[in-house]
UniProtKB/Swiss-Prot annotation:
Record-annotated disulphide pairs: 35-59, 39-55
High-level lineage: Eukaryota, Viridiplantae, Streptophyta, Embryophyta, Tracheophyta
Primary location recorded for the protein, binned into one broad class: mitochondrion
A single GO molecular function term of this UniProt record: metal ion binding
Superkingdom of this protein's organism: Eukaryota
Protein name as catalogued: Mitochondrial import inner membrane translocase subunit TIM8
Entry domain remark: The twin CX3C motif contains 4 conserved Cys residues that form 2 disulfide bonds in the mitochondrial intermembrane space. However, during the transit of TIM8 from cytoplasm into mitochondrion, the Cys residues probably coordinate zinc, thereby preventing folding and allowing its transfer across mitochondrial outer membrane.
GO CC term, one of those recorded: mitochondrion
Length: 77
Protein backbone atom coordinates (compact mmCIF):
# COMPACT_ATOMS: atom_id res chain seq x y z
CA UNK A 1 0.00 0.00 0.00
CA UNK A 2 1.19 3.50 -0.79
CA UNK A 3 2.38 5.02 2.53
CA UNK A 4 0.41 8.20 1.84
CA UNK A 5 -2.80 6.12 1.71
CA UNK A 6 -2.18 4.64 5.18
CA UNK A 7 -3.36 7.88 6.80
CA UNK A 8 -6.39 8.36 4.55
CA UNK A 9 -9.40 8.37 6.95
CA UNK A 10 -11.86 7.33 4.23
CA UNK A 11 -9.70 4.37 3.25
CA UNK A 12 -9.21 3.34 6.87
CA UNK A 13 -12.96 3.54 7.50
CA UNK A 14 -13.67 1.51 4.36
CA UNK A 15 -11.15 -1.15 5.39
CA UNK A 16 -12.63 -1.34 8.89
CA UNK A 17 -16.14 -1.75 7.44
CA UNK A 18 -14.97 -4.47 5.06
CA UNK A 19 -13.22 -6.31 7.90
CA UNK A 20 -16.39 -6.12 9.99
CA UNK A 21 -18.51 -7.30 7.06
CA UNK A 22 -16.18 -10.27 6.53
CA UNK A 23 -16.37 -11.18 10.23
CA UNK A 24 -20.18 -11.07 10.17
CA UNK A 25 -20.28 -13.23 7.03
CA UNK A 26 -17.94 -15.75 8.65
CA UNK A 27 -20.04 -15.84 11.82
CA UNK A 28 -23.28 -16.36 9.87
CA UNK A 29 -21.67 -19.12 7.82
CA UNK A 30 -20.37 -20.90 10.92
CA UNK A 31 -23.70 -20.50 12.75
CA UNK A 32 -25.59 -21.86 9.75
CA UNK A 33 -23.31 -24.88 9.53
CA UNK A 34 -23.41 -25.65 13.26
CA UNK A 35 -27.17 -25.22 13.62
CA UNK A 36 -27.94 -27.11 10.41
CA UNK A 37 -25.86 -30.09 11.54
CA UNK A 38 -27.48 -30.01 14.99
CA UNK A 39 -31.11 -29.49 13.96
CA UNK A 40 -31.63 -31.03 10.53
CA UNK A 41 -31.21 -34.76 11.08
CA UNK A 42 -32.85 -36.04 7.89
CA UNK A 43 -33.28 -34.85 4.33
CA UNK A 44 -35.21 -31.56 4.48
CA UNK A 45 -38.58 -31.33 2.82
CA UNK A 46 -40.13 -28.25 1.25
CA UNK A 47 -40.67 -26.82 4.76
CA UNK A 48 -38.98 -27.31 8.10
CA UNK A 49 -40.94 -29.25 10.69
CA UNK A 50 -41.98 -27.34 13.80
CA UNK A 51 -39.27 -29.09 15.84
CA UNK A 52 -36.60 -28.27 13.23
CA UNK A 53 -37.74 -24.66 13.08
CA UNK A 54 -37.72 -24.36 16.86
CA UNK A 55 -34.30 -26.00 17.10
CA UNK A 56 -32.84 -23.67 14.44
CA UNK A 57 -34.27 -20.62 16.19
CA UNK A 58 -32.91 -21.62 19.60
CA UNK A 59 -29.55 -22.70 18.20
CA UNK A 60 -29.08 -19.40 16.36
CA UNK A 61 -30.07 -17.43 19.47
CA UNK A 62 -27.63 -19.36 21.68
CA UNK A 63 -24.88 -18.93 19.08
CA UNK A 64 -25.48 -15.16 18.94
CA UNK A 65 -25.62 -14.91 22.75
CA UNK A 66 -22.31 -16.76 23.10
CA UNK A 67 -20.72 -14.62 20.38
CA UNK A 68 -21.74 -11.47 22.26
CA UNK A 69 -20.36 -12.83 25.54
CA UNK A 70 -17.06 -13.71 23.88
CA UNK A 71 -16.79 -10.30 22.18
CA UNK A 72 -17.52 -8.49 25.46
CA UNK A 73 -14.90 -10.55 27.24
CA UNK A 74 -12.27 -9.78 24.56
CA UNK A 75 -13.14 -6.08 24.60
CA UNK A 76 -12.79 -5.90 28.39
CA UNK A 77 -9.25 -7.28 28.35
Amino acid sequence: MDPSMANNPELLQFLAQEKERAMVNEMVSKMTSVCWDKCITSAPGSKFSSSESSCLTHCAQRYMDMSMIIMKRFNSQ
